[in-house]
Curated annotation (Swiss-Prot):
Matches recorded under InterPro entries: GTP-CH-I_C/QueF, NADPH_dep_7-cyano-7-deazaG_red, QueF, QueF_N, QueF_type2
Active site: C183, D190
Source organism (scientific name): Idiomarina loihiensis (strain ATCC BAA-735 / DSM 15497 / L2-TR)
Compartments in which it is found: Cytoplasm
Keywords: Cytoplasm, NADP, Oxidoreductase, Queuosine biosynthesis
Annotated gene: queF
Single GO cellular component term: cytoplasm
Catalytic activity: 7-aminomethyl-7-carbaguanine + 2 NADP(+) = 7-cyano-7-deazaguanine + 2 NADPH + 3 H(+)
Name recorded for this polypeptide: NADPH-dependent 7-cyano-7-deazaguanine reductase
Residues annotated as binding NADPH: S86, K87, R250, G251
């Protein structure tokens, strides 16, 4: 099926009525294969990973009709056949607003069941009360920030040929807060920070920054941008590689895709812009 036809059914970019009662049918899957095949990703993935979502606008009614509020943490495995389209995720969460449920545990279990069905593989959900999060510090990525460089930038359309390496090998962790791409459907800007931990040919930092900035006019979902960056860097001969992006929230949700061929996902709180 052509990519356009596969995406035509999505509520993203279309006028949508907000549901007033719990409705799992709001969730819409997007096959990951649509954007994996063009960048050389087959069924056997060269990485493991997870899409870590945070939901800040979650509410429902308890058995007595009293509103409950929570922050939700959702982990969608990168191995799932589908990613979850973000607007449909928002509409799904909003469908809880005026529906009654007996316990927090039941709501969490219900979300796990529905999201797992959409993704095509088990999804983990954790709902936290606000009291559990008060006083949490704002996190930052480890390693060296490459943003403060006195360089000229002229490419704002995706250009992997900008990447360059030096002759010797190293292991290092780098990050940038200058990642910006655009929604595949609506063209709305997606702002993010990206972390790169690698062992292999030393990356030219000026070239890496120019490459990341070249996503500025690129249209792709968050998860797909991270996998594209992973593939481009892996093609340089990296022996070990992690790419992890944390995006600013939209519609009460942020998306934080993690991909690595050698380490588990970093455990960290939200960043300054989240």
């Amino acid at each position: 099926m052509p990519k356009k036809d596969a995406l035509d059914h999505l509520s993203l970019g279309q006028h949508t009525d907000y549901p007033n009662e719990y409705d799992p049918k709001q969730l819409q899957p997007v096959p990951r294969s649509l954007n994996r095949e063009p960048i050389g990703l087959k069924d056997k993935l060269p990485f493991s990973g997870v899409d870590l979502w945070t939901g800040y606008e979650i509410s429902w009614l308890n058995a007595n009709g009293l509103p409950q509020v929570a922050v939700g943490y959702f982990a969608v495995p990168a191995e799932s056949p589908n990613l979850i389209e973000s607007k449909s995720f928002k509409l799904y969460l909003n469908s809880f607003n005026d529906s009654r449920f007996d316990t927090w545990e039941y709501v969490q279990q219900l979300m796990e069941t529905d999201l797992s069905a959409c993704a095509g593989t088990p999804v983990k959900v954790k709902l936290k009360q606000l009291s559990e999060l008060e006083g949490e510090s704002v996190a930052t990525f480890p390693g060296h920030c490459i943003d403060d460089q006195n360089i000229s930038i002229s490419h704002y359309d995706y250009q992997p040929s900008l990447l360059a390496t030096e002759q010797h090998e190293t292991e290092e962790a780098l990050h940038s807060h200058l990642l910006k791409s655009n929604c595949l459907i609506t063209n709305q800007p997606d702002w993010g920070s990206v972390y790169i931990h690698y062992q292999g040919p030393k990356l030219d930092r000026a070239a890496l920054l120019a490459y990341l900035v070249s996503f500025r006019r690129h249209n792709e979902f968050h998860e797909q941008c991270v996998e594209r960056i992973y593939q481009d860097l892996k093609a340089l001969g990296m022996k070990k590689l992690t790419v992890y992006a944390r995006y600013t929230r939209r519609g009460g949700l942020d998306i934080n895709p993690f991909r690595s061929d050698f380490e588990p996902a970093l455990q960290m709180q939200r960043m300054a812009r989240q």
